[in-house]
Amino acid sequence: MIAKIVQNRPHHCYIRSMQNYLPSLKQMQYLVALHEHGHFGRAADACNVTQSTLSAGIRELETLLGQTLVERTRRVVRFTMLGNAIVEKAHRVLREAEELADMAAAAAAPLVGELRMSVIPTIAPFLLPGLLPRLRKERPSLKLFLREEPSAQACESLHHGAVDCVLLALPYACGDVEAETLFDDALFVAFPGDQAEELPAMVSADQIDPAQMLMLEDGHCLKDHALAACNRPELRAGARMMGTSLHTLVQMVDNGLGITMLPQMAIEAGILDHTDIDTRPLDSEHDWRTIALVWRKGSPRADEFKMLADIFRKHKAN
C-alpha cells in the first residue's frame, strides 16, 4: 500500500520531497573548483567568493551526502575516492545545467552572449588576427572567450565543459563530438635558403633526411599530421622533436639547423617574413590537414556552431 501511494504521488511532489537532500549547483561548482585548483584560496578566487564561503559550501555538501569528499591538512588538499567520483559526475551535471541555459539563449537569438572556444597553437596566431575583426563586425553581440591550448587539452576542456567548441585540425581523436570541416590546409617543407637551388618543384617524402627534420614537441597534432603525410616510419624515429612553436622551428631552420613542415595558413600569415627560408609543396597523397570546428555531440548550440563555421569558411574564401 505504501509503495502504491508513493507511486501515485504527483511528480512535482516527489521533486519537492527531494529538495532537502539534493546537492545544489553552487556546491558542485565549489567542489569542482577545489579539485581543479587544489587550494581553497585559489578555488575561492576562481568562484569569486571568500575562502570561508567556499569551505562552508563544501562542508554542507559533505554533510548532505553523509560522506567525506575532501581530506584537509595544513598543506595538502586530497580528495577521497568517492570525492573524485563525485567531481566527475559534478562536471557532467554542471555542463548539462549550462547547456540548459544555452538552449534558452540560443532560442532567443543565435550567436549572442558568451561563447568559449579553444584554438590550437598551430591555428590561433595565423587565422584569428584576420578572423576576429570579421566576427566582431558580423556578430557584435557575441562575447567570444578564447583559450589557446594543444589538441589533447582542448578536447579535455571541451568534454569537461570548460569550453563550448574547439577549432582544431583533423584527423584527431577528440572523443564523442560533432564536427564542421572548414577547409584543407596544405603542408609545405621548409628549407634553409642556401638549399633552394638544389630543390625540385615538389619534394617527396623519400627526399627528406630524417636527421634534418625538426618537429614540434609531443602534444601538437601538426607533428602527427606531418609524419602521416610523409608516411615514412623512419621519420618518426629519426626526426628531432625540439620546437615548442612553429615560430621557434622557423628560427631554427633559418639558422641552418634543419628543415621542417609548415602549414599553408602560417606561410600566408607571414611566418617566413624577414627570413631566407624557401618552401616546397610536399608530393604526397595526403599533403594537408583539415581545419574543423568541433563541439560536444548533442549540444543544444549545434545550430549556432554551424553558423559560426559558415563565418569561418567565408573568411577563408575571401
Language model features with spans:
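Central regulatory/effector-binding core of bacterial HTH transcription factors
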Residues: 112-175, 243
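Flexible hinge/capping segments at coil-to-helix
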Residues: 174-213
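Interdomain hinge and pocket-entrance segments immediately C-terminal to HTH DNA-binding domains
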Residues: 6, 24-25, 75, 81, ...
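Short helix-boundary/capping micro-motifs
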Residues: 32-53, 74
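Secondary-structure junction motif
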Residues: 197, 203, 212-233, 301-309
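A late-sequence structural motif
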Residues: 127, 277-318
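Hydrophobic hinge/microswitch elements
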Residues: 150-163, 168-169, 219-278
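A short LG(V/I)-centered, amphipathic sequence patch enriched
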Residues: 62-84
